[in-house]
Amino acid sequence: MKAIMVVGTTSHAGKSFLTTGLCRLLRRRGDRVTPFKGQNMALNAFVTIDGGEMGHAQAVQAWAAGTVPRVAMNPILLKPQGDMTSQVIMLGQAVGTTRAQEYYQNYFDRGWQAIANSLETLAQDFDVVVCEGAGSPAEINLKHRDLTNMRVATHLQAATILIADIDRGGVFAHVVGTLQLLEPEERKLIKGIVINKFRGQRSLLDSGITWLEEYTGIPVLGVIPYGQNLFSAEDSLDILERSGRPSKEDIRIVVLRLPRIANFTDFEPLEAESGVYVDYLPLEKQLGNPDAVIIPGSKTTIADLQALQNSGMAQQIMDYAQAGGTVMGICGGYQMLGQTIADPENIEGNVSNCQGLGLLPLTTVINQEKITRQCQTITHAPPSGLTVTGYEIHQGLSRRSEHSQDFLPMFDQEELGMVNAQQNLWGCYLHGLFDNGAWRRCWLNNLRQRRGLDPLPTSIGNYQEQREGMLDSLADFVETHVNLEPILQSLPEENETP
């Protein structure tokens, strides 16, 4: 299996962006291509067809490669849950919770074996693997326990691209410093440099590129202009960089920026809708009068519920709902909208019981069993009879109160969610719900009707069709600005995984 690796001088340099583009470009060439990230730290997760959990970014890269996501593409997923701890997902299954200083001792050897085995498995089905690193490959204090960067590149003898973010400044120092801190055998693997997020006239950079190529002996493959809307962010920090203002005609949907927000990829289909403004609102801000409020998923539901309460946002939401405003909770947000959340085994932390917002007739008990599965079900609202798909990722069971005549199941599978008769209070466990185009438009039309706006057409495809177009545009963008021939020519005819 031939191997390409993308590493970055810093976090947010554009590794995911470039890896995704490469996957689509290689697919166009007719290669059987797979993405790979040995270890990912993220709260955006996806569930595979066999119920395994993996990073959502690697699922997108799999779709770019024209293949089905599988856990071997991301054998280790670390999901931060606060207090310097992370849940460890290995080969799709939760295997424990660990602190950073304990991770190397308890999981390093096991993790590397999972990575090596996954690469061997992928080699049976694919011609080319495009690997993505994490952070920087030159973190001296972390290098001995780095499972993601040059250890993988060396294992595969991968043709490696170093990508750097010029927008933050210091790009030449970042590139040269990174190269100098690599071991000689690692540096030999770097076959090209890409400069990302350039603003301004390209010719102004020419003298710097000439110097960089002469100094390092490594070609600069391209300069990618700043294109922040071409690819979704993998990390919740990037929500801070999303900008824009709603017009008077826009439907404004507030998504609460929880401290431990998870799976905010749920809202990409809403962001892609013209006439919809998604506002990721910090808890300390005033809610105002949006068209809808969504409480998203959370890795630590009780802690984020307490943050809602302590900030005063919980009271604002309850007042807003009392006045007829539309409120939706997804996964952890669904649990928060209920009466109580109990954690008798202290799985999330030291709080054993917490009062919810009381907007839904629901009680939740967090337990050890983690539910991860894909779902297909039939909707009851709005309207009834639509087939929708999505996936569940939650650690807890929710029960509907007996005295809840005003609430109806959202789906045929009643445990997945509920809605009140007025259709302004919603809650469900289904991630990816807004990916279903007809259902999304019907839900938005409810909001538009309240504003006196005309309804949108509902006979549309699902978001995956739109995403395919976005992936093609991303690949076109990369192909226009990056010369990949030196990388492709550097690949051996046969590169067997050791």
Swiss-Prot record:
Gene3D superfamilies cross-referenced by the UniProt entry: 3.40.50.880, P-loop containing nucleotide triphosphate hydrolases (3.40.50.300)
Family matches, as Pfam families: CbiA, GATase_3
Chain ranges of the GATase cobBQ-type domain: 250-439
Keywords in alphabetical order: Cobalamin biosynthesis, Glutamine amidotransferase
Disulphide bridges: none
Top-level lineage group: Bacteria
Secreted is among the record's keywords: no
Pathway terms, separated by semicolons: Cofactor biosynthesis; adenosylcobalamin biosynthesis
Claim: Chloroplast is one of the keywords in the record: no
Record-level Gene Ontology MF annotations: ABC-type vitamin B12 transporter activity; catalytic activity
InterPro entries in the cross-refs: Class_I_gatase-like, CobQ/CobB/MinD/ParA_Nub-bd_dom, CobQ_GATase1, CobQ_N, CobQ_synth, GATase_3, P-loop_NTPase
Location of the active site: 331 (nucleophile), 431
GO biological process, one term: cobalamin biosynthetic process
Similarity comment: Belongs to the CobB/CobQ family. CobQ subfamily.
Stated role: Catalyzes amidations at positions B, D, E, and G on adenosylcobyrinic A,C-diamide. NH(2) groups are provided by glutamine, and one molecule of ATP is hydrogenolyzed for each amidation.
Protein name: Cobyric acid synthase
Source species taxonomy: Bacteria, Bacillati, Cyanobacteriota, Cyanophyceae, Synechococcales
